[in-house]
UniProtKB/Swiss-Prot annotation:
Residues 1-54, 490-516 are annotated as: Disordered. It comes from Dictyostelium discoideum (Social amoeba). Gene3D superfamilies: Importin-alpha, importin-beta-binding domain (1.20.5.690), Leucine-rich Repeat Variant (1.25.10.10). The lineage of its organism: Eukaryota, Amoebozoa, Evosea, Eumycetozoa, Dictyostelia. Keywords: Cytoplasm, Nucleus, Protein transport, Repeat, Transport. This is Importin subunit alpha-B.
Length: 516
């Protein structure tokens, strides 16, 4: 949050949820869209048969080729160019089998150094291509198998091959580096340290001028360069932003998906990172992609927009000014639970803004859908909807709070007081207390806090009293303050709620697994 929001919240007489929690960044154990199958499975990719080639019977090929390994090794180590190409191609075909390719068996033959050597043979591009293809598939294996490729010096020569005059060799080098970078953050940073990014970006400067397959593979590799925790050095990967700003307009779904994922990784972090993403002029198109018919595109687009609105109010307003709210309203009704959850999280960071931004959420007719999810959705979504409503009560005007109450937010907030997650109990208490604060101001004019009766009708008073003995210190303090400040008349009616001699021990427990 920026300074003005902190000052506003500090000026309130009560102790509220810590001010820097109102707007919530994504953390390792945080709320996130579960990686979709494509993202998970394609951190590494194996090149398989050439399109149009005859399908190979897996079992017969493996058995045949494994029997021939000694002779193939002899041929690949010969000085005969024809035999070298023939045996390298045979190894490539063996490694291109779709299911359970014998990567380990090939590594054990000791041919990897020889394959790397072939990459340097500029006057033999067909051999370069076959060797690069074989090494790409070895690098698609386990971390140990990828390490064999790295330890034999392949990264350096693959980076050189990004500038090869031969299209197929360049594309295979792109693919290989994507597989190596996709192995781990260590491998990713190793590839980046070999200065692989500039020639890759050079390939993508004019996407319309190169083959679609190259654009797809290069964008996928670029996405792998940007992904992972710990994050890659931003001073290196920030150079990707102008290229990604072009790629999100490319008319190919695979390219869109990977370009959006790359932007989601780059926008995840400090306000300074967020500003650089905004300055790349991607917000309007990313908001437009929230309405893409394919969920695989919506997902990273929403992740990116969600990251941007974790920034300050001005950064959030950039997103609102390009009509994000109408798309977010639609996403609250997505058939995908993960999308609904992330949309709620995104809205919660918007309602952590100023009163004008809260009004924009109200005007977009989002509150009824939020309240519905708060009352009826799965608990993971309810938590995010609770943050969205609670943040709106913290930063909203009395009129805005009145509107929230009129939409039925009180009962589902009260119902959350019975859950086991202390963090969400405190979020719900925060919302309830903010509503009572607004009601107390109204009572100064009318003599009656209108919201106390609504909370009572929602069985909120009993739930609040039940929390007096909660072991979480923050919960106890909030409940004690609510009772003493707003519910004293009920306390007198019911007698001593805290008998003399009672003692409480508090644990400063927080739910480390809570999705922030």
């Amino acid at each position: 949050m920026q300074r003005s929001k902190q000052e506003t919240r500090k000026s309130q007489y009560k102790k509220s949820i810590d001010s820097d929690e109102s707007r919530r960044k994504r953390e390792e154990a945080s709320l996130s869209i579960r990686k979709n199958k494509r993202e998970e499975s394609l951190l590494k990719k194996r090149t398989q048969a050439v399109p149009g080639s005859t399908p190979v019977k897996v079992d017969s090929l493996i058995n045949q080729r494994l029997e021939q390994l000694p002779s193939l090794v002899a041929e690949i180590n010969s000085e005969n160019p024809d035999l070298i190409l023939k045996s390298t191609t045979a190894f490539r075909k063996l490694l291109s089998i779709e299911k359970s390719p014998p990567i380990e068996e090939v590594i054990k033959t000791g041919i990897v150094p020889r394959l790397v050597k072939f990459l340097y043979m500029q006057d033999f591009p067909q051999l370069q291509f076959e060797a690069a293809w074989a090494l790409t598939n070895i690098a698609s294996g386990t971390p140990e198998q990828t390490r064999v490729v790295i330890e034999n010096g392949a990264i350096q020569v693959f980076v050189l091959l990004l500038s090869s005059p031969h299209d197929d060799v360049r594309e295979q080098a792109v693919w290989a580096l994507g597989n190596i970078a996709g192995d781990s953050h260590y491998c990713r940073d190793l590839v980046l340290s070999h200065n692989a990014l500039p020639p890759l970006l050079s390939l993508l400067q004019n996407p319309a001028a190169i083959k679609v397959s190259m654009v797809r593979n290069a964008t996928w590799t670029l996405s792998n360069f940007c992904r992972g925790k710990p994050q890659p050095p931003f001073e290196i990967v920030r150079a990707s932003l102008p290229v990604l700003a072009k790629l999100i307009y490319y008319q190919d779904e695979e390219v869109l998906i990977d370009a959006c994922w790359a932007l989601s990784y780059l926008s995840d972090g400090s306000n300074e990172r967020i500003q650089e993403v905004i300055d790349a002029k991607v917000c309007r198109k990313m908001v437009e992609l929230l309405g893409h018919p394919t969920i695989a595109v919506q997902t990273p687009a929403l992740r990116t927009i969600g990251n941007i609105v974790t920034g300050d109010d001005n950064q959030t307003q950039i997103v609102l000014s390009v009509q994000a709210l109408s798309h977010l309203l639609n996403l609250l009704q997505s058939p995908k639970r993960a999308i609904r959850k992330e949309a709620c999280w995104t809205i919660s960071n918007i309602t952590a803004g100023d009163k004008n931004q809260i009004q924009q959420v109200i005007d977009a007719n989002i509150i009824p859908s939020l309240v519905y999810l708060l009352a009826n959705a799965e608990f993971e979504i309810q938590k995010e909807a609770a943050w969205a409503i609670s943040n709106a009560t913290s930063c909203g005007t009395p009129q805005q709070i009145h509107f929230l109450v009129s939409q039925g937010c009180v009962k589902p907030l009260c119902d959350l007081l019975k859950v086991s997650d202390p963090r969400i109990i405190n979020v719900a208490l925060e919302g309830i207390e903010n509503i009572l604060v607004a009601g107390k101001k109204e009572a100064q004019v009318t003599g009656v806090n209108p919201y106390k009766k609504i909370i009572e009708d929602a069985d909120g008073l009993g739930k609040i009293y039940d929390l007096q003995h909660h072991m979480n210190k923050d919960t106890f303090e909030k409940v004690s303050r609510i009772i003493s400040t707003y519910l004293e008349d009920e306390q007198e009616d019911e007698g001593d709620l805290m008998p003399e001699g009672s003692s409480f021990s508090f644990s400063n427990q927080t739910n480390s697994n809570f999705n922030l």
